Each structure stands twice: as C-alpha cells, then as structure tokens.
Design a protein with these regions (language model features):
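Residue patterns forming the tRNA-binding/recognition surfaces of aminoacyl-tRNA synthetases
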Residues: 4, 13, 17-21, 91-241, ...
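N-terminal catalytic cores of NTP/NDP-binding nucleotidyl/phosphoryl-transfer enzymes
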Residues: 27-94, 100, 123-138, 161, ...
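Conserved oxyanion/phosphate-binding beta-strand-loop segments in alpha/beta enzyme cores
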Residues: 1-36, 66-75, 99-106, 210, ...
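Catalytic alpha/beta core of large soluble enzyme barrels
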Residues: 58, 71, 263-362, 367, ...
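Helix-rich, typically C-terminal accessory recognition domains appended to large enzymatic cores
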Residues: 79, 144-158, 410-441, 496, ...
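Basic, alpha-helical terminal appendages of large translation-related enzymes
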Residues: 1-21, 25-32, 260-263, 272-275, ...
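Amphipathic alpha-helical
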Residues: 195, 200-224, 260-302, 447-479, ...
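Alpha-helical recognition segments enriched in aromatics with Gly/Pro capping
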Residues: 306-312, 316-329, 358, 478-613
Length: 803
C-alpha cells in the first residue's frame, strides 16, 4: 500500500537537495540552451497566479531542454529603475531605494516557491552601479557614434507622472504606466536615433521565429511607406512648405493644405486678420492629447490667411491648421485631396473648400459628390497631361515625374520616430553628459563610469520639466572633461527601458568590471534561444532590445544582431468574467495559500491546464483540486507497482510509446494544456492496465521522466523511490518508436451501398481477401441481394455494392 502523498514534506526535501546539490551544472561538454523570462518590475504588490504562468512555462521548457542534454542558461534579475518602481515609492512615501530592495526580497521569495531552476549566481539588478555602468557606457558609445543627440521639441508629457514619454509609451493617447491622458510639452530632450536602424529592424523580422502578431505590430509601428515629398511655394514669401504624400498621382486634386499646429511655420503664416485666431487655436491644440486629436469626431481648424501654390498647375491652395495633423509624422504638413480621402472630404465640406475629382471609375466624373471616391483603381481626370492614365500606374510613376520636374522627390517615409530618451525623474540612470559653455555636450570619460545616482531626500518629480537632480548643486556643478572649465551635469535620467534593452547580455558575465560582456562568453552562450513574456512588450521592450543589439553588433561587442531567436507570448490569467487581476479590483489570487494547501507541483500543473498558454484564461480555484487528485492517483499507481516484477506486455509497450509520442509532440508545439490532459488520459489507461496485471517499471519510469519538467518534486521523489541515486533531471528524455505504436488490430466500418451496417476488427496489414471474407461473415443475413462489387480501402473501410 502506497504511503499518502505529502506535498509539504516532499517539496521541502527536494528544494533542500537542489540547493545543496545543483542539478544544472556546466561540464563544458554539453551544448547550451538559453531560456529567458522577461525580468519583472519589483512592484510592491508581489506576484499573483497570473505572474506565475509565464515563469512556470519557461521553467517547464528549461527542464525539458535539460533532459534533452543541454547545459541550461536560465537566469533571473530585476528591472528596478524607472517609473513603476518610483511611482510605488512615491505612493508609499518611502525612498525608492528602500522600497525596491524590499520588493525584490519578497518577489524573490515568491519566485523560489515556483521551484524554477533559476541560476541566482547570474542575477542582475538595473539599479546596481556595476550594472548601470554599462548602461551608461552604451549611451556614451551611441553619443560618439552620432546616435544620441539633443533636440528641443514638443514631446509627450504625462501630467500625472510629471515626465516626458516616448511615443511607444503612449497607448491610445494615454500614459502606458498610469493611464492619464497625455499632453504635449516643449522640452529639450535627449534622443536616440533609432530611425537610422528602421530598415534593418523591419527586414530582419524575417529571421525571427516570433509570433506573426508581434512581427506585424513591429512592422506597423515602423510603418514604412513609399511616396513623394512635394514642395509647395508660399505665395508672397521666399519659402516653401514640403508635404509628404503616398498619393502623388492625386496632386492636381490638392485644393488645400493642412499644417500641424506645432509646425515651425504655423505662426508666421498668420496674417494680421487671422493672427489672434491662429494663436488661440495653436494654444488649444497644445492642451489636447493625441488621442483626442485623432479621434473620429468633427474636425476643427483655422485658416492662416496665407496660400501656397500647387507646383503642378499653379493653383492657389489655402493653408489651414488642424490638430488632426501631427507634427511628428511625415513633415507635419499634408496636401489635402478631398475628392479621394474621407477625412479631407469632411474637412472641405465643413469649411466650404473646393473639391476636385481626379480619379474616376471608367473616366466618368461624379456630379455633386456626397462622399470621397476612395477606390484604389480608376482613370485620371482633371489632371492635365496625366488625363487618361490609370491611377495605379501613375501612383508608381508620379514620384519620378515630380523629381524630374524639380518640384519634389521620391521618398521613403517611416512612422517610427527617434526615441525620446530623457526622463524628468530621479529614479533612473544618470545620463553621463556634461554641458560646457565652450565645448557643448561632452560625455563623461568611460574610465569614470559609472556616474553614480546621488542620494537625495526629495525625489518626487517637480513637474517643471526639470529633474529632482537639478536641485543638487554640489552634484550638478562640475568641470568639463575636455577643457577643465566650470560646467554642469545633465540632470535628466534615462527611461526604464535603458537597462532592459541589453540586460540579457549581462547575465552570462555579470561580474565582469572590465567589459560589458566577455567576447568568448558571448560567442559561447548568446543569443537567447527562447524568450518568454507578455505581448504587451511587443513594440516597446522588444523593439528597443533589437535596436541595442544591432548597435552593439555594429561596434563589435557581440557577433549577432538579433537578441531573441524564438519568442513565446503567454496569455493573461484573469479573474472572474475575464477581468484583469489587480489589487484595486480586489480579484488578485495569491499563490502563497495555494502552494500551502495543494503544493507547488499542483499549482504549476494547473497554471498550464487552465487553458491554451498563448490565450487569456479565467482562473478558478476549484480547478486545482482536480489537478491535485491526478497527482495523488499517479503517486499511488507508481508506488503500488514499484516492487512488482511485471514484464512489459505488447499493450504496455504500445501505450508507453504512444505516451512519449503524444507528450513530446504536444510539448514541442507549446500545447501545454493538452500535455496535461494527455498525462491524465494516460494515467487512466495505466490504472486500467494495472488492474489487469500491473504496470512494468520501464513504463512508469518513462512517465516519471516526462512528468518531471511539470511536477519536479513528485517526480524526483518517485525517481528516488524507484532506486535511482541521481536526479531525474540527469536522465534522458525518452524517444518513441513509430512501429511500436502501431495497433495490432483496428476497427473499421463495413457498409452496404455506402451505409454502415457493422464494424470488424482487422490487422491493418492483413490480406484483402481475408478481410472481405470477415466482413461478409459479420454482415450475415444483412446482405439482401447480389453482391456486384467489393470495395476495400486499406485500414479504412469495407463497402459492398448490392443489387
């Protein structure tokens, strides 16, 4: 009789053993496999069952790779600088240095409850000066390469977080962190020239084994388009306004022009009659968030009083301002062709601007247009020398024609904008720049890095556009590294993405104080083979990491240019009715009580069983009870048969190979919920076979090895009980034999005139005549008439044609 399954005693025993005798040891002979989780923000609320999901998935995959003979690189660290940590500290009224350390301690305890096989010797923390020395070093290298520069510009401003935001941190016009509507603020900012890498970031997506959804999100964010820039002279001025258009074929239909209110020429285009209205409109637009400006509601605008000249036909084009045009896309100015664009049509109709149709179906002009004609194809009309051409042909040829005329040029445009890298906050890496009145912006010498973040009592954001560091005069005032003259330090800090854009490189050489990563170690252990985390990072972190990796490859630090070979995005675990778990909603399920009551192994398995891992799944506490019962049943099955000297029957051999086949293939396709259902299904089969005469040792040990990545504690205990002195994770992942899986007999239907009358059991490789004879015997007196034709589809069906 098997002793009861005591999860508390068993799990504590094996955690102690793993700590004293690590199971993942680099012997220098095994190939490496680098499996990485997106490292967490050390938030104050700790981990809930939703966080566990990604960590369990990565741990299962990691242990699977160990059993396949790899040396596993599976580290963990802390994304501890930036807004999440600082906002929590402000909320608690405690210095972020203290709250961050406390939160890390708590989350590390919770992560250890998962029994994940993390190598804590590789741990990194983005707030550690030994780490952010290299974050600053990368910035200095980018500065020297011309990729980091200063620019005064209207930036996204979060009035709640009181800091600037990159475009990628604005979701539907709101701050990605706190959800507040984002406004615009003119500030001098540090920028990173990510746009220089736009084509490589786009083209190299083809190299990656990533979800197509993520690749599309990055493709759309980079937003490459082909078109033309067209120069419109301003009437009465020796100036031109350049517009970008993807439809230069419609240039004859441009009846007005719209500039973003932030456009450099917006104010100077105002006449005496319009100046007051123009300045009021510009001010009102500055108070709106981008989401308000782009929402599909009634368009607003103001006429500047000035005109541009259509360079193709000499027509006067009124110049308007409207907040539906954004300064940071294209040139911040658009030519408007209301006959062929819904938004332009709405604007022209509201403000009584002429509408000229230049593309028509079959060349026939629409009288009294009530909506824009937006069909892609048509014949050119009202277009001078272009009349009669097919618009699809002209669209391709027009950029070169415009270029030859000297009124514009063929252009490729990107939605991607340079990365706003400054943050007006305290809790971040100091930007290693000194501002000298003589020399300008000068980088801190590399040998003086890290530039330490000074200790302060007042760390709250100022909201003035200045970082709290600006008040520390003894830190700000310094000397120029170039000329020795009095100078001032840069007081903005880096964004939270600075450290997370390269941290995965540092794990494999985290104690190196001479270089970011030793080249020999980088060549041996990098890049990441499998990266696991939420899809919410598709554009932000994943795009920035690719940019940093390409830059570090360019300067010779590493010899690869993509950080993560394969990516898996797990879905969210939600509370009831699909609502996201959060403390404020009161629907957070803590793993601590579940581990105490059911054990870590039960919780790990339920995290996977709850639904397809790539989809959101609703949590139900009752589900873990069923998983716990399954583990107890297998525990009893294994121990009840442990000492039985049972010889493997053909049926047991077949079941064993099918078990290995099904579990392996489901695991390889990341169908982890069906892996768990497979374990349950085969456990039931083995329990039935056990009643008939027992289960052989090899079949049970095979099951234990397969189960080990999912339920490591119970698997280790059973492996030991079966007489093994080494860890189950030093075993080898079982293989299956297709021949051994074949059924000796299968059931096939027997039909008369296409209608099934009975079934027969046959050998799939049996003789056709014997099978037909067996079929006729089984039918007996059901055959009424003369058999005209006998059909046998091997292994599938018998059909008799009877008349």
């Amino acid at each position: 009789m098997a002793e009861p399954y005591n999860h508390r005693a068993i799990e504590q025993k094996w955690r102690d053993k793993w700590e004293s005798t690590p199971i993942n040891v680099n012997d220098g002979k095994k190939p490496k496999y680098y499996c990485l989780d997106m490292f967490p923000y050390p938030s104050g609320s700790g981990l809930h069952v939703g966080h566990w999901r990604g960590y369990v998935i990565s741990d299962v995959w990691s242990r699977y790779k160990m059993l396949q003979g790899y040396y596993l690189i599976h580290p963990m660290g802390w994304d501890a600088f930036g807004l999440p940590a600082e906002n929590y500290a402000i909320k608690m009224g405690t210095h972020p240095k203290i709250t961050t350390a406390s939160n890390i301690k708590n989350i590390k305890r919770q992560i250890n409850e998962i029994a994940a096989i993390y190598d804590w010797d590789m741990e990194v923390n983005t707030t550690d000066p030994n780490f952010y020395k290299w974050t600053q070093w990368i910035f200095v290298k980018m500065f020297k390469a011309g990729l980091a520069y200063e620019k005064e510009m209207p930036i996204n401003w979060c009035p709640s977080c009181k800091t600037g935001l990159a475009n990628e941190e604005v979701v539907d016009g709101c701050c990605e962190r706190c959800g507040s509507p984002v406004t615009k603020k003119n500030l001098k900012q540090w920028m990173l020239r990510i746009t220089k890498y736009a084509d490589r970031l786009l083209n190299d997506l083809d190299k990656l084994d990533w979800p197509e959804k993520v690749k599309k999100m990055q493709t759309d964010w980079i937003g490459k388009s082909y078109g033309a820039e067209v120069d419109f002279p301003v009437e009465g001025k020796d100036e031109k306004i350049t517009v970008y258009t993807t439809r230069p074929d419609t240039l004859h239909g441009a009846t007005f022009m719209v500039l973003a209110p932030e456009h450099a020429m917006a104010k100077e285009l105002a006449t005496d009659e319009t100046r007051e209205a123009v300045e009021k409109y510009i001010f009102n637009a500055s108070m709106k968030s981008n989401v308000d400006r782009l929402q599909d509601k009634e368009k607003t605008g103001v006429f500047t009083g000035s005109y541009a000249i259509n360079p193709l036909n000499g027509a006067k084009v009124p110049i308007w301002l409207s907040d539906y045009v954004l300064a940071d896309y294209g040139t911040g100015a658009i030519m408007c062709v209301p006959a062929h664009d819904d938004r332009d049509f709405e604007f022209a109709t509201k403000f009584n601007i002429p509408i000229i149709q230049v593309i028509a179906k079959d060349g026939k002009e629409i009288e009294n247009m009530t909506e824009a004609y937006t069909e892609a194809a048509g014949t050119m009309i009202n277009s001078g020398e272009w009349n009669g051409m097919e618009s699809s042909v002209l669209k391709k040829e027009a950029p070169l024609m415009i270029e030859k005329m000297g009124i514009g040029r063929k252009t490729v445009n990107y939605k991607l904008r340079d990365w706003v890298f400054s943050r007006q906050r305290y809790w971040g890496e100091p930007i290693p720049i000194v501002h000298c009145p003589k020399c300008g912006a000068v980088p801190v010498p590399e040998e003086e890095l890290p530039l330490l973040l000074p200790e302060v009592e007042k760390y709250q954001p100022t909201g003035t556009g200045e970082s709290p560091l600006a008040d520390i005069t003894e830190w700000v005032n310094t000397t120029c590294p170039c000329c020795g003259a009095p100078a001032k330090r840069e007081t903005n800090t880096m964004p939270q993405w600075a450290g997370s854009s390269w941290y995965f490189l540092r794990y494999v050489d985290n104690k190196n104080d001479k270089e970011l990563v030793n080249r020999e170690k980088a060549d041996k252990y990098l890049p990441v083979d499998m990266y696991i985390g939420g899809v919410e990072h598709a554009v932000l972190h994943l795009l920035y990491s690719r940019f940093y990796t390409k830059f570090l490859n360019d300067i010779g630090v590493i010899d690869f240019d993509e950080p993560f070979k394969k990516l898996f995005n797990q879905g969210m675990i939600t509370g009831k009715n699909g609502i996201k778990m959060s403390k404020s909603k009161g629907n957070v399920v803590s793993p601590d009580d579940l581990v105490r009551d059911y054990g870590c192994d039960s919780l790990r398995i339920y995290e996977l069983f709850v639904g397809p891992p790539e989809l959101d799944s609703e949590w139900d506490d009752k589900g873990i009870e069923g998983v716990n019962r399954f583990l107890k049943r297998f525990w009893k099955l294994a121990l009840d048969n442990k000492d039985n000297d049972v010889k493997a029957t053909p049926e047991l051999i077949k079941v064993r190979h099918k078990l290995v086949h099904d579990i392996t293939n489901r695991l390889n396709s990341f169908s982890l919920n069906t892996v768990i259902s497979g374990f349950m299904e085969y456990n039931n089969k083995l329990m039935e076979l056990s009643k008939k005469g027992g289960v052989d040792k090899e079949t049970l040990e095979t099951y234990i090895i397969l189960l080990a990545p999912f339920a490591p504690h119970v698997s280790e205990e059973l492996w030991e009980q079966f007489g093994h002195t080494d860890s189950v994770f030093h075993a080898t992942w079982p293989e299956y034999d297709e021949e051994a899986m074949k059924d000796d007999e299968i059931e096939i239907p027997v039909q008369i005139n296409g209608k099934t009358k009975c079934t027969i059991a046959i050998n799939p490789d049996g003789d056709k005549d014997e099978i037909l004879a067996k079929a006729k015997e089984a039918l007996g007196d059901k055959v009424n008439g003369t058999i005209r034709k006998e059909i046998y589809v091997p292994g599938r069906i018998v059909n008799l044609v009877v008349k």
